Each structure stands twice: as C-alpha cells, then as structure tokens.
C-alpha cells in the first residue's frame, strides 16, 4: 500500500475508508494472480506482526504515526498522522495540532517527545521511564529505525507543551556524576601545575570567585592570571570548560566562542562559577540550582531565585538577518542591564553588562557582530574594576564615571581648568590657509566631506572649517564668480549625504511600527544614526552663517571689475542666484535634519512617557539602593531616580550629550529641547485627561506620586540649563497636577476666576473637566464658587479644545550670532590644524599627479626619451600656505616656516646637517635642530600635535618609473644614485627579484639595496635587507616617508625621510634616514606611489611588518637634502 508524503493540506481518512481501500486493492490482486499468490496475499496481514516495542507505528499500516496527546487533551489517547522517514518533528507537530483541533501557528509552544516506558499493573497503566524532546529537524521514523528500546520497554511519541518539558528538565539533578567529575578535574589540575600557589593574603575561610576583577597580587609582582579566555601559558581551564560545555550540550557538538553569543563572568559568588556560558540554544534559564530546579545557567548566590530570568532568541523578522536575544526577568527577580533594572523583556546587545542578584555581573558578547566593545561599556568596566579594587572610596575623582549608569562625572573645577589651559595651547597663532587649483576642486570637496568619521574623536566642525577655507580661496584666487559654483557643489553634496543618512535611519526604524516592536525601542538604538544627522546639521549651520557673512564681500570683486559688453551684470546676477540657491539648500538641510532628530527622539519618548504616570517615586527600588551603596556619594543624578523617571531623563540626557558633543549651535539646542518639552507636556496632559479616570490617576495619592515624578524631571532640566524652557512648556501639565494635588479645604476656597488667573495655561474646558473629576474623586457636592463665568460658560462645552494638539509646536528659527567657525582666529585647535595639514598633503598629491616635479614628465615620455646623464633635477615646489605656523616638540622643531607667495619659486636643495654614524655601521640620524616640514611625517591624523604627524589618504596613482643611468648596461652591476642595481640579465627570475625580494618590477629598474660587502669594514652586523616589526604608538610610527621621485635621487621608491626621537621607528635602532621600504605586511611597495604606500601603512593595523633595504651614504644624503 502506498501513501504520499505528509503535507499541511492532507487529512487522515476514516477507518472504514481505509478498510474499503485495502479490500479493493486485495481483490484486484486476487483476480490477477495465481492461486498460490492469492493465498500469500490474503495471508499477509496474518503473517506480519506489530512490534510491541513500538507503540506509535504498526507494520500493517506503514506511513501512519500515532502521536499520543494525553498531556494536551484530557481523555484523548492518540491521533494518527501520515509520515515518511523524511518527515521532521516540526511538521508532524503541526499535523498533530490540527488533528487535536488546535491552532497550527502555536507549534513553537509544543514539542514532540520520544518517550520510553512500559505498562504496569492489571489495568496496564503507562509508566514513563525516560523522556527526550526531539529537535525541530529530527526525523522520528528514522530515529525509530536506528535506536530501539531496551527489552521489556516500549516507545511512543507524545506531544507535550514545551514549558512543561522544560520544567521537568529543570527538576532533574545529577549530583553524583557532577561531584565525581569535579573531583577528577581538581586532581588533574593539581597534577598539571604541580605545587599550588596560594594568592597573597588569601584565607581558607574566605570564598572568592576566581573570575572576580580584584585578583591583584603584590605591588611590582606579575599578576597571576588564573583563568582567561585569551591565549596564554595557563591551559588548565580549557579542559574544564570543554567538559562543562560537553555536559551541557549533550557531549555531541562543540561550540566555539567565536561562533556563538556568550556571557563572560566578570564578578561571581564562589570558585565553582564557570567563566563562560554559551547562549547557543533557543532559550536558556538562569537561576539557582535546587532539588526541584536545574536551570541551564546555575548561579549559587543565595539572592538568586530558582528561576531568576530567561534568555531567549527573539523572533527573526524577514527584513532583518540578525538574531537578537531577549532577557526576560521573572517576578521578584533582580535583573539589571547596564546597571538599570528591567521588568519586561529587553533586548540585549553586544557589550551590555548583565547583573543577576547582588553579586553576579556578566559581559554579553556576540562574536558574530564583529564589532569592538562600545566606549560606554569600557567606561563601565574601568569603573567596575576600580570598585572591586577598592581604589575609590570617597568622592569620585576627576574623569571618574558613575558606577550605576557609566556616565562620565563632570567636575566643574576640572572643566574650568581645561578651558583655562586651552588658550595657552592654541597660542601659537597659526593662520588657516588652504591653496588648491581649480581643476582639483571637485576631488578636494569630496575628500573633505568624507574625511571625518562622525563617531570618531576628531573635531566635529572640521568639515565646516575646511570647506569655508575652500570657499575663501576660491573667492580670492579664482576668476570672479567662481565661488558661486563651489557653493552649489558643497550645498548639494551635504544635502545628498544628509538625505542618505536619514533614509537609512528610516529603513532601520521601519521595523518598529508594530506595538510589540515599538515597546522595545530605546534611545541607545538611535544614537549611531543620530550622530551622523547631528554632525551634518551642525556643520551646515556654520557653513550657512559663513556664506551669509562673507558673500557680500566676495561679490564686491565682481562689482569692481571692468564691464565688458555687459558681462559684469550677468556674472553678478548668476553669482547672486548661485549664492541664494546654496543658502536655500543649506537651510533645508538644517530644517530637515532638525525635524528628523526630533521625530525619532519623540518616538522613544512616546514609549517611556506612559510609565511616568504610573511611577511611584516614594517606593524604594533595589537598583537605586545598590547605586547609592556602591557609589558612596554618587553625584550622578540620573542613576538615583526611579526607574520610570530615569528612562525619560535618559532620553533627554542622551540628546543633550549628542548636541554638545557635535557642537550644535546653542540656539538650536534650546529649540530642540523646547520641542521635546512641548511634546512631553502634551503627551502627559492628554493621557491624564483622557485615561485618568479609568486608570485612577485623579486619586490624590496617585496625583502626589505624579507630582513628585514631574518635580524630579524639572530638577534635571534646571541642572541641565533648561529651566526657563521647562517652566514654559510644562506649565499646563504642572497646573493640572497642582490643582489635583491641592487639599479639598484649600481648593474649595478658590473661585473660578481665581483659578483661571492662577493657571492661565488651562483653557476653560480643560479647567472645568479637571474640577469635575476632582469633585468626583473627593466626593464633594456642587460648589457654586466653581461655576464658570458668563464669558467662559460658552467655552466649557467645546470638547474640541479639551485635548492639546501637537501641531502648535514651537517654531524653528535659524540663529544669527554665536557661531564657532572663525577663519581669522589666531588660535586654532590642534585637531583642526592636523586635518588641514592632511588636506594640504592631499592637494599636493593631486598636483604631483597633474604636474610631475623634479624634471619628470609622464611615463610615456620617460620611456620614449631616456634622461640625459649628469642632469640636474629640479626640486619639488613648496605647497605650504602663507602663514603656516610652527609645530614644536620638546627638542625637535617639525613645523614649517612661514613663507610668502614666492616660496614656490625657490629651490629646496639643502645640505645635510648633523649626520653621524653609530658603531661604524652607517646608522644615520638627522640633527634634532634640523627644520623639516611637519607634513612629511607619517603618523595618524588624530594624534596630538606635539610632534605633529600627518599622512595621505589613498589616491592611487603610479609615478613614472625610470632610472638615471650614468654608465652603460654592459656591466653586471651598475651604481645609480648611490645604490647597487642589477642589470636586466640578473634582476628578474620568473617575474620576481632574484635576490629574494618579492614583488614584480613592472619592467623598470629601481635602486637595489647595498650588499653587505659595500657597507664598509665594520658592517658585519648589518644586513642589506631585513625585516622590522613596529607597533604604532600614541603618535603613530614616528617615521616620515618620501617618494624618491621628489628628491635629488630622482628615482621611484619609498624612502625614510624623518625619524622622530623616542618613536617606535627610532627605538628599533635599525632604521635610518634613507633606508628604502620594500614591502609592508607582505605587500610589495615596488612601483607604488607615496599615497598608496601611506594608505597601506595606515590600514595595516596596529602592528606592521616592514621589509627594509639599507642604502648607502650617497642615497641617504640625497634623501636628507630633499624637502617634503
């Protein structure tokens, strides 16, 4: 008999129908077969017997699976479903639910169980011996063929509720096996490490978690790392972790920490706590192990409940590929996320700190996110380490953070000291200037707009400064009216970037439209995207003001020019139109970004504001007590607030931090908080009036709680400097709460006219509704004194005015003063000037591509016309602007000298000063007093300016490669520019250099490193080619590079131009000025230009490996004599 595969649309035929089909099929065979065959067919059901060990299947009815459902439907024995060996447990659950008249969509709440048991007693009652829940993808029929029950036992498949199965699993406890294995592991560890070393000061009567943060040895003693997830010499923990993981995962599959989310224990309760807990299941239970409960994550602290919380995977949306984990606390379970108590399912993110009870603190890590820990998490970890070490026992020190929320504690004295020191550091009077050619305008604008990462540490107004310098140079240098086109380019590019960022944010937040997802939305989810929007809003405001102030002066050049055939009028008109269009676009960008920020911030307020009306600030919350106890004297006002109020204030505080971090204009900051306060006031007032009677908010006890919560909110606004805005926009809600909180004896003495005068923000219909509800709650009779006046009586029936409208929000007004971008200022912050030097390098790179220096033409000319011998190369022109200041170190002058406009016409050939040799090996260092251009030094741009280092972004372009040859090619080796070079017969083997240096030659000769025999009699310890590993320091590598084409060497190659004393490169001791960099991290630099080489070093990571070739004295002198 043949049955098709099971599907959701098939239903099981009745027994009579099955018998008819079987009888018909048998009769057909009976008519067509011989008598012997007829007898075998008819006798087949009698010969095949059912297996008594398998109760869910029958040999006489293959393809039919009996699923027993006593646990979900009382009185129901079993239901039959069609199944094949390929049918999965999940599909069979759906079919069985349909047979049991249950909804198939709830299949996730049920599980198919493989149950082993037997019948006992005269009434043959089923007794379960073993139960195992099948996975969704397991195949019951295949499982049945591979594993058979023990003799005397039978198997059947049961449908049970998932929660009941998990509860049964939690009650099981195996203490014997755990104790035996624990003792074996202990003996194994003792044998592996020999004599056990006790921690200094430890006591046998004290129980301390091995994974706590305060395991610090004696001063000067190397810390003992007992257990760690990082590679190291101690390996005893790995065996224990693997065994624990094998026990918890069934011993079948090993899960890597780099593949699964996990909890890393930061602070535990005793030494039996595990260091890592993998979160590789659909759901994990956290709790204390008892006789009746055995959770997945067992914690031994006495304040942890048997079922403390759950960690489960959230339902994955089709539009999202990532899987989020939800932390679900149970009733009376103390669970904190980032030191904030939660009472509802909360999504946890990579880097969150989870606290269970009063002792356990975990770090949640998700390796799949491939992101570093957030900065706020690192701040919390540093603060937690100080807390565990007991270093901060009193008032918080400068730069400390709140131990509850991780926020940086601002000290007024420290801020004043920083502000007083700022002018002293910027007193170098560096004048800002940026020169470029008109042909490079588009490339320069695009580079400036992508230069700064909004989430980085650079000055947030750097794009505004650099773009205003571009506008200034265009207006003063290029033909009249050229700056108008530049304004349009800048405005349109900023508009495009702002729209793209807001569009990305809208697409991300589209998934939070349903109420369930919207309830999980928090302000921290929006911060990464809001950073971009605040960044460009702030820069657009500064650029708009610069255009408004400087455009009239720039247009005067057009008015003063000679009028030729009416060209002046048309040019002036076109420039004015372009100027107005650019300002209009920037105004739209400011308005649009402001509206988008307000929209998403109010969206988070919409989620947290209802809790403010239900909050009881007079109750004691464990999180607040823990904060006060941990901080001693906590100056962070947010962490001691009640939970509901803290959520609202967190939105305001995060917004304030973003506005200040991105240096948004102070007037725009005030306007944004005016709108947020307006939204909060209207939302709270409308909910109180609309839902107050049903929710009991008009009861005086509840009103007093609301009044206390609002007072906390207003106190925060006052401390944040927004007191006048809060008093203005919270007037209506505060008036309502004040009336409802007044005692009946006092309020009944006030007339309607007096109430209207004292609370002018309330409309007559609103005041009438409030007094009516007050009468009902206070059980007061009619009060004639509250009767509306004749002029107000007509308005009390206008219910359209009862609730406030969100359309009457405060307007957005662009500021007119108080801007920060000032190009004429003599004191400029180091970060801005550092980026300016970087952009000057970028412009210099564009110039060298367009106009090759040093007498070099393009590649074709170089190949077509070989350079003449004894030719004198021309020096590279200067690219330093007028008034460029000096950059000083303690003993090294690295800044460029201020030069006039004629500096570009001067030669730069300079003799080498102060070159000396060490041990006769040819190690050379430039004199510390030698003046060099600071823009030549290779160091990340976000480092301090003492000494100043900059680098060039990748802008790949290969320079012409040619060699100035002073001798013929008849020799086996020729010496060019002081370096030994092989002839074509010796320099290439299978496309690679024959002396072992990897990398294609691109068909061009290049200076080879000097062999050992040519370095002198005392150079036995020097190799011609060697490998150097350097770690980037706080100021980068401390090494400046230069392309040999732009030196008197006149040959391509990347050479060391500068070594900063005490830098990583100089500290290595092997690198010298003039040495050539052949490769970086295995990537050849032969044939690469300067910008590509610097970009490769920049993106190479914190540790770089260089292949370096030694150069002789002649090459070093030419490199040293060059100017950057």
Curated annotation (Swiss-Prot):
Annotated ranges, domain Ras-associating: 61-164
Alphabetized InterPro entries for the sequence: CBD_Rasip1/Radil, Dilute_dom, FHA_dom, PDZ, PDZ_sf, RA_dom, SMAD_FHA_dom_sf, Ubiquitin-like_domsf
Residue span, FHA domain: 284-342
Superkingdom, taxonomy of origin: Eukaryota
Sorted UniProt keywords: Cell adhesion, Developmental protein
Domain Dilute: 516-809
GO MF annotation terms: GTPase binding
Domain PDZ: 1027-1112
Record's compositionally biased regions (Basic and acidic residues): 238-252, 903-912, 960-969
Region (Disordered): 226-253, 850-942, 960-982
Compositionally biased region (Polar residues): 926-937
GO biological process: neural crest cell migration; signal transduction; substrate adhesion-dependent cell spreading
GO cellular component: microtubule
Skewed-composition ranges (Pro residues): 866-876
One Pfam family it belongs to: RA
Tissue expression summary: Ubiquitously expressed and enriched in the anterior part of the embryos.
Similarity-based family: Belongs to the RADIL family.
Miscellaneous comment: Knockdown results in multiple defects in neural crest-derived lineages such as cartilage, pigment cells, and enteric neurons.
Complexes and interactors: Interacts with RAP1A; in a GTP-dependent manner.
Name recorded for this polypeptide: Ras-associating and dilute domain-containing protein
Gene assigned in the entry: radil
